[in-house]
Amino acid sequence: LNDDKKRKAFIERVGEMTLKLRNCAKPVIGMINGVTAGAGVNLMLACDIVCSSEDAKFIQSFVNVGLVPDCGGMYLLKETVGLQKAKELMFTADVISAQEAEKLKMVMHVYTKEDLKIETEKIAQKIAQGAPMAIMYMKKMLNKSYANLKDFLDEEALVQTFCLGTEDCKEGILAFKQKRQPNFQGK
């Protein structure tokens, strides 16, 4: 990448991966096993739920090569761990363990290497049992920034009004009354 236009185009394409993860209508579950560095950490932060093995390690390594984090890493890390901790992790390039990443809420669940895939799949299966449209709207609203609570409540009212008219809502209410699992169809 020997000119600014090419470098900028490359970085923009890399950033698009983050947006695709964040804007995907379905939940994205990250499963981390081993060392995750740089852009890998930032793409992980764009996932909705992250599970890792107990021996996983994470590093914001950009400063070691004279770069700032890409893939929205500064935004996502600050959003996840707070401003000061994000600065510390980026400025120092300290390696953090899976256990520390879990404490910082970068990772939601830590499992043994042997259980990682099975347990992550259990989470995915549990989510898949939910109403697809409701989950899609929850993800969309949780990922969106609102100026204030009133703006959020206005959008919530629109989305909830729509959801109340869906076949999934009718099925969910009927299943609740009949004390059975709902069979959602995404309608």
Protein language model features and the residues they cover:
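Short C-terminal tail/terminal secondary-structure segment
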Residues: 181-187
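Short amphipathic alpha-helical interaction/hinge segments
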Residues: 131, 135, 146-149, 184
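Juxtamembrane helix-entry segments on the extracytoplasmic side of multipass membrane proteins
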Residues: 151-154
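Short clusters of hydrophobic/aromatic residues that line enzyme substrate/ligand-binding pockets
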Residues: 1, 77, 184
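Crotonase-fold acyl-CoA enzyme core
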Residues: 19-133, 157, 161-166, 170-174, ...
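Glycine- (often His-adjacent) and acidic-residue-rich active-site loop
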Residues: 1-20, 36, 66, 147-148
